Amino acid sequence: MYNSSNIIDYVIDAWEKLQEQAPLVQCITNSVAANYAANVLLAAGASPAMIDNPFEARSFTEISGALSINVGTPTTEQIQAMQISAKTAHEHDIPWVLDPVGYGPILKWRSDMVDELLQYHPSVIRGNASEIGALAGSLVQSKGVDSTLKSDEMFQLAHNLLTKTSCVAISGETDYILSNAMTCIVKVRGGSHLQPKITATGCALGTLIAAYCAVAPVHLATIAAHIHFAIAGKLAYDQAQTIGSFNTMFMDYIHMMDANLIEQYACIELISDD
């Protein structure tokens, strides 16, 4: 049985393992996010590798601790690499995270490709409310790749996705995490309103989830990554209220995270999953 206290203990344990193991995370991500996501992983203690070449995908996925796939700016070659790596991860029980950026009727090509990737059962699907809602089959519209709906309007629909994945994370002002391994929904609060003003923060969160998945059970890894991000965002905003300075402090706190900060600042709520 989970409660707020023991979840925080599990998160601290996951963070400690992340520091000890520095897992190798293969990232097939978009051209806007690659540099930022790699730096977030390095700051958090993981080892990123941005291998998105279909000729190298299989061999590299086989040696990775986890895989992160983000469909933000897909190319034909990237899609081939995604399919190969997702299949390889599925065959070798390597955890992998799917970030269906922009999923919906407007961007049909990528959305069809995401539908194909679901056959390889991602360990985690992470997205904003509109992406998760669209993927779950609701009749929502997505404004580009930005969410037009609140997370709390979508989390019930996310249950539909738990037949395709072990865990669903809906990112927003408040984050919601649902999993087949829990009888509750975990709400994670924190962060800052400046985070959406910085490109690639959501994409980087997806890669951080993958890093934690390499060292902890999927549902706890997803919670840990969101708490890590939320605390870094809160503490960064306490120090800096302008975007440039906030971005620097945010990366600093991703790196400076420790057990004491997690215990002191993690803000979660468990709600009934009826």
Curated annotation (Swiss-Prot):
Catalytic activity annotation: 5-(2-hydroxyethyl)-4-methylthiazole + ATP = 4-methyl-5-(2-phosphooxyethyl)-thiazole + ADP + H(+)
Record flagged with keyword Nucleotide-binding: yes
Top-level taxonomy: Bacteria, Pseudomonadati, Pseudomonadota, Gammaproteobacteria, Moraxellales
Purpose: Catalyzes the phosphorylation of the hydroxyl group of 4-methyl-5-beta-hydroxyethylthiazole (THZ).
Any one GO BP annotation for this protein: thiamine diphosphate biosynthetic process
Organism: Acinetobacter baylyi (strain ATCC 33305 / BD413 / ADP1)
Sites where the protein binds substrate: M50, A200
Name the UniProt record assigns to this protein: Hydroxyethylthiazole kinase
EC number from the UniProt entry: 2.7.1.50
Family statement: Belongs to the Thz kinase family.
Binding sites annotated in the UniProt record for ATP: R126, S171
Keyword Kinase: yes
Keywords per UniProt: ATP-binding, Kinase, Magnesium, Metal-binding, Nucleotide-binding, Thiamine biosynthesis, Transferase
